[in-house]
Amino acid sequence: MANETSGRRDNRVPFRASTKTPNIMMLRRTRLLLIVCGILAFAVLGIKLFSVMIIHHDEYEKMAIDQQVRETEITASRGAIYDTNGKILAMNASVDTIFISPAEIAKNNEDPQLIARELSEILDVDYDKILSMTKNTDRWYEVVKRKVEPDVSEKVRAFKKEKKLIGVKIEPDTKRYYPYGSLAAHVIGFVGQDNEGRYGLEQRYDSYLTGSTGRIIRATDNRGTDMLFVNYEDYYDETKGNDMNLTIDATIQYYLEKHLQQAVEDYDVQNGAAAIAMDPSTGAILGMVSLGNFDLNNYQKVSDKDQEAIDAETDPDKRSELLTAAQQKQWRNKALSDTYEPGSTFKIITLAMALEEGVVSESSSFYCGGSIPVLGRTDPVKCWKTAGHGGQTLTQAMQHSCNVALVQIGQLVGARTFYKYAEAFGFLNLTNNVDSSLTAKTGIDLSGESGSIWWSQNTFYDPENFSQLAAASFGQTFTITPLQLITAVSACVNGGYLMKPYVVKSIVNGDGEAVVSNSPTVVRQVVSEQTSATVRQILEQVVGDPVDGTGKNAYVAGYRIGGKTGTSEKVAQDAAGGAKEYIVSFIGFAPADDPQIVILVLLDTPSSSTGIYISGGQMAAPTVGKMMADILPYLGVEPSYSETEKTYMDKTVPNVTGLSVEQAKAALEEVGLQARVYGEGNTVTAQLPGSGAVVASGSTILLYAGKEPSADKETMPDLTNLSYQTARDRMAALGLYIKTNSSITDTAQIVSGQTVAAGTQLDHGTVVEVTLVTSDSSMLGRY
């Protein structure tokens, strides 16, 4: 028994020992495992925290900010653009951005279809496009339309209020507005929908005109809604863009555009036109025009003619190509981007260099037999007057615009000296590569300026071939920009100084401090004061001589005007008919003894269908004359009339209403007008035209004595190619009147244009302005 008991104890002890040892080991292992797991967990957490707080700090911070705040941009106002007198040419107008918040539409159970339908109708935006936006329920900002006018925004606001919509939003914005529409369009340029400059000065100086965007930052909840009990808002002011002041004078610009557009219509100009007005003493651009024009407020719209061609095309791709081509054409600034052969206007430059070199003087004489042989040419150079001008002085050679005389003058100057002056006048830059063609630009502060194209030095200097020198002497076989020509001619008449042209006078910040300031810059003196004075005297005779002056159609009574005509044949010709195409031009300056303004007009491809002879003298010269007639009085230049001019010039109708018939007749006769009386009364009760109207000298004023003027209308006749006197009398028979803007030199001049189209219905007493040109067939030529 004892042995059995003893044996049991022996069996139990090992049993207890064997159970206790595994428990301890398991506990230890568990503790170790927990420690390891803890270490691993903390390691992972530490790594994660390191990643979040250190490695990806910026990313998670941005995510947190995006969830906790809402940021609203405040659009900065773009700087205004002013003309030289402070008239606003470009400004900002208040508009709105209409957007939706799909997240709020979903949150507030608003009707997406209703919203899409109403906004589509009000804003003229595709319904499906808006409906698709509403499905982006994770988004808070989807723009439906930008630059919405206030009256349209009010309709959206009324819809939003009526339906109590939270998800439809209206945000204030600004858009660029041009008060004068198309005025100076090619200079000012325009901005896109994003308010970034896309063309003209708006593009070139975009960084100056653009302000700094402001911001409002507010606290929001996890749904992006403003938190009700958290007063947190940061406001960062926007900074307005800098203002720009131009040298452009809006009034001068208007006169340039008005008369250039009239010339395009009168002469059926096919390929646009350009005009530039410059202050010759400073180089400041007073006006710059390129036609066809466009409205800066609707710059993508093309002309009706171009739109018809686009609408007629059925292929969408070709329609798009036509639209792009039409837009690029109308946006192109012919005044500085197009090059052309200047023709006879360049004779001014040849004259100036020859006088400066002393190879000619006012006493020099030249003989023109109608042509002149030139070394290197098979055919002789012909003058526009095939019979020749015979013997002539230097002044007469310029008055006649004689090619033969200018070839002789060019040969006296010589090829190398000619190119030396061409460089000095800014037309080319001489290089060490004598075989390369030459070019140059004025460096004006406008984008898009093209460079000239001239023959290489080796070609031009060839001692066995004078053909290039001969042609260049009268402005052919090279191309320049209109801007280069007016800059060089200004140097010829301002005392000899080549000025750098510019259009930006200054750019000022909000404190009125100039951040950009431009002033007259003398590039170099090209000719002497004496040479310049002689050039002015000779060119005044080109306009002022009523017999020999080829520029006499630029004449304006009471003013001394100098200038030169130009007619150049275009290289391209009509393939089918072989018809020649021309660019006609005129450059004039006034007053001739002390020029305050130089004006260049260029008409690209006038039509022969008008019956007016195609030449600078018949088309461009009278256009410049009309511009001068308006601009010189505006500049404060006082006219001085000769007795002959007083006889021919337009008359201002006096007020004779209330006078006796006899007194009225006497008052009209005193100012060079006649009278026709209707009625049997003794007192004038009405008159046509009314007092203050300006009419042609010798016009018949209608006086009513106890009889009422007729309310009937008259049909405007076609006066083209009628003599001044015939046109005046034909209009008088209808109770209508003409005025000439004091451009008449003799009653035999003919009408080349009228400001009111034939067939227009007019009231009795209406005054129509006409353009007069010489009727002397011996003066008709391509000069």
Residue positions per predicted region:
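Soluble non-cytosolic domains of exported or imported proteins
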Residues: 76, 106-113, 146-150, 195-199, ...
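Conserved helix-loop functional segments at active or binding sites
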Residues: 262-266, 324, 541-544, 633, ...
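Beta-lactam-recognizing serine transpeptidase/beta-lactamase-like catalytic domain environment
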Residues: 5-12, 90, 96, 223-235, ...
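Periplasmic/cell-envelope proteins involved in peptidoglycan metabolism and beta-lactam response
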Residues: 1-310, 339, 416-424, 556, ...
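Extracytoplasmic
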Residues: 69, 74-77, 84, 92-95, ...
